[in-house]
Amino acid sequence: MAKGFKLKELLSHQKEIEKAEKLENDLKKKKSQELKKEEPTIVTASNLKKLEKKEKKADVKKEVAADTEEYQSQALSKKEKRKLKKELKKMQEQDATEAQKHMSGDEDESGDDREEEEEEEEEEEGRLDLEKLAKSDSESEDDSESENDSEEDEDVVAKEESEEKEEQEEEQDVPLSDVEFDSDADVVPHHKLTVNNTKAMKHALERVQLPWKKHSFQEHQSVTSETNTDEHIKDIYDDTERELAFYKQSLDAVLVARDELKRLKVPFKRPLDYFAEMVKSDEHMDKIKGKLIEEASDKKAREEARRQRQLKKFGKQVQNATLQKRQLEKRETLEKIKSLKNKRKHNEIDHSEFNVGVEEEVEGKRFDRGRPNGKRAAKNAKYGQGGMKRFKRKNDATSSADVSGFSSRKMKGKTNRPGKSRRARRF
């Protein structure tokens, strides 16, 4: 116990020492900060020069901003605007170079003075140029420009024109007929304006159309279907259905033409000695037929697979429902058992609690027992119905008088097969 007490004393003493050291350090920091604040600031000649330069730059920037505002308000050309932008860029570059020089240090004061004078002269020249540009009229632009500036301006203008053309081409709409429907496409399709001048088209058709009605069917041999084919097609994107509709239309037209040619007594069947090659060969038509059959079988298989998936989902739903029902029943029975146990402890059980419904369950499962089971009856007759087997095999008056199981046919045994000679005699 003594050792533990000493250790506690040492720890508390050490903590007190640390607190005292922290307080001393805080006081020292506060005093140093107060002394720094009270120290007088020493202003050198270099600091004054820097302040003057900063003030001059600020004034120049303000003047340039004012000039640019006036310039924008007046109707000046794009070339003058570009010149102003170039001069502003030069000013920014000069500011950056001056900042780098100040960071490196003031080594040569004489060199700095010269640079300052040169900068001041350049700034004054820039101011004069800006004032001239602001006061100049739009009519005297071509006279004041030099050849180099004009070439540069032409290049810039050409670039701007090319950019504008590209933007216009990008913004141009594309007709809806030329667009492939794609989710990633950025093009906005538009509908072309169409003029459905039916009168003019009918008039043109009358001028071009030959009077076939006046002539016989043999001369034109053209059949027009009375009904529209697309009316009978449910899905126009179904290749099989569409091909069947075309086939039916052509077959109807052939039958009409056949009747007309028969009426005119014109031979239309191919002679027996004439063999002409079809437009599409039999191999090609077999390929088309096979492709159509394959597509139809694939479609049927997809539908069957979809139906099986739906049945599987339904089966899973039924299974889940039955499992949930079982879980609920189990939970209810467990809760009943638990409540009965609790009531048994406190002797609060009534006779109604034991009304489980066993008799109803048995009555529900009871089946018709009017007809005896034949298999069971035969076994009982052979082996007995259980119980004591002693003295069962001994005869009495009733058993000896019972002749129901006797058969003379069975006593005789099985009849032997006759020989070959007897069998031959039969036939």
UniProtKB/Swiss-Prot annotation:
Modified residues (Phosphoserine): S104, S177, S183
UniProt keyword Membrane, yes or no: no
Region Disordered: start-end pairs: 29-190, 361-427
Swiss-Prot/TrEMBL keywords: Coiled coil, Nucleus, Phosphoprotein, Ribosome biogenesis, Ubl conjugation
Top-rank taxon: Eukaryota
Record GO biological process: nuclear division; ribosomal large subunit biogenesis; rRNA processing
Any GO molecular function: identical protein binding
Entry comment on modification after translation: Sumoylated.
InterPro entries xrefs: Ebp2
Biased composition (Polar residues): 397-407
Compositionally biased tracts (Acidic residues): 106-126, 139-155, 163-185
Tagged with keyword Nucleotide-binding: no
Positions in coiled-coil regions: 45-174, 234-265, 291-348
Location, primary (coarse class): nucleus
Compartment(s) of residence: Nucleus, Nucleolus
Sequence similarity: Belongs to the EBP2 family.
Subunit: Interacts with LOC1, NOP12, SIZ2, ULS1 and WSS1.
Name of the protein in question: rRNA-processing protein EBP2
Source species taxonomy: Eukaryota, Fungi, Dikarya, Ascomycota, Saccharomycotina
Gene of this entry: EBP2
